[in-house]
Design a protein with these regions (language model features):
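Secretory targeting and sorting signals
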Residues: 2-36
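Basic polycationic patches enriched in arginine
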Residues: 10-15, 42-43, 314
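An exposed, glycine/acidic-rich loop-and-rim segment of catalytic or binding clefts
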Residues: 37, 43-410
């Protein structure tokens, strides 16, 4: 395609089965954490070592119990649900030392069980982002998935990993409060082939560093694309829109989409477009431009192809060895800065276009358009149908291995 950029192929995320998932430590504390709120006015500086606690958090309609875990380290506190692996709250200090929640979410389980939940804080699988017409062919066999986003399948379809109860184990150590989440997805689940065993580890280190490590194995060829769908507002949950946040993306290209938000197959240069975030740019600066891609997404809802080093040198390396910076988000008002590093070749920037004032958040206010944004590290949308995109295939004897680090400073 004229003007098209080369694709940053990435295969280092798959390792042989000899590098199997690490076993976790079994220790679950039972102290009940504080309730989920927005900014609480606490001042940072006290700190402390890593701690975890767990409490009941209701049950799904079929009676499956849900837990809420609280992970704390230093001035940072994170609450995680076993339902969907949801990051419900993440409390960190701002530039003045005031501690506040910087992610969007619901105060109770009912919000996450609702069909209106826009994947707040959820783990996404089996396949993050969209697959065209819910259909792909693997090794000569065509697989049909249920569709849930117009004609397409989004985030694994109805009943995806964001709607499952994961098994949680405390795997904390002296350096981090850590939680391991495990989910087994049977052959044919969501229409995907192969029994997939997925392990996701949240590791909270001081000061305000969260590592998300994904691993998965399969007993039959399949496709996998896992991500985390946290909505960020560095000024504080419920504080208004994020249009003054300044975003930098380490990407010279992005994947344009059609009217149903399926990539055309091209990786187009960002130069001269509203998609050029190679220098820090306020999110609201160009979001109202009459660009056809902006119109398709009603704002930003696109995948950027990250500028990566030569991947050939990374074959067989551990996931964390291949980490590279992907994005930097800064809020001038609070002084908070979020830096994202990842082993993935792409990142989806979604500017909260479909928040419509009908959802009540953890702080008691409603979320309107642009009140939060998602930065989802990933392989590319619709890769199973796009032979020129980095492969998302996973086969028996391989391990899906991906790491993303979120670090907040102020």
């Amino acid at each position: 395609v004229p003007g098209q950029l080369p694709l940053p192929f990435r295969t280092a995320r798959r390792r042989t089965l000899a590098a199997v998932l690490g076993a976790g430590l079994l220790a679950a504390a039972l102290a009940a954490p504080a309730g989920a709120t927005g900014g609480d006015g606490r001042r940072g500086g006290g700190g402390g070592g890593p701690t975890t606690s767990v409490e009941p958090f209701g049950a799904t309609p079929d009676g499956t119990a849900v837990e809420r875990w609280t992970l704390s380290h230093g001035d940072t506190t994170m609450r995680v649900l076993t339902y969907g692996g949801v990051i419900q709250t993440l409390e960190v200090p701002d530039g003045a030392g005031e501690v506040g929640n910087v992610v969007l979410g619901f105060a109770d389980l009912a919000g996450y069980l609702s069909e209106d939940d826009p994947y707040f804080g959820s783990l996404i699988g089996r396949y993050g982002n969209r697959i065209a017409e819910g259909r792909f062919t693997l090794d000569g066999t065509t697989h049909q998935l249920p569709v849930n986003d117009g004609p397409n399948t989004l985030h694994g379809g109805p009943g995806g990993f964001s709607e499952r109860v994961w098994t949680a184990t405390d795997v904390s150590d002296d350096e981090a409060a850590a939680l391991q989440l495990v989910l087994v997805s049977a052959d044919g689940d969501q229409g995907f082939p192969g029994t997939l065993t997925t392990t996701v580890t949240y590791r909270l280190e001081a000061p305000s560093r969260l590592t998300v490590h994904y691993q998965a194995t399969t007993d039959a060829p399949t496709v996998v694309n896992l991500t985390q769908h946290t909505y960020w507002n560095l000024a504080g949950e419920g504080s208004g829109d994020v249009y003054d946040h300044e975003l930098r993306l380490d990407a010279s290209g992005y994947t344009p989409v059609d009217e149903t938000l399926i990539p055309t197959g091209e990786v187009a240069p960002v130069d001269g477009t509203p998609f050029d975030f190679r220098e820090p740019t306020p999110i609201g600066e160009r979001i109202r431009q009459a660009d056809q891609q902006i119109l398709f997404g009603q704002g930003y809802d696109h995948n950027w192809a990250l500028d990566r080093a030569d991947d050939g040198a990374r074959e067989g390396s551990d996931s964390e060895d291949a980490l590279e910076q992907a994005a930097v988000l800064h809020d001038p008002a609070s002084g908070r800065t979020l830096t994202i590093s990842t082993t993935e070749p792409g990142i989806q920037f979604y500017s909260g276009n479909f928040l419509d004032g009908t959802l009540v958040g953890t702080g008691g206010g409603v979320y309107r358009q642009g009140d939060g944004l998602a930065l989802e590290t990933q392989h590319f949308p619709d890769s199973p149908n796009q032979p020129d995109f980095p492969s998302t295939e996973l086969r028996p004897g391989e391990v899906y291995d991906s790491t993303t680090v979120f670090e907040i400073t102020s």
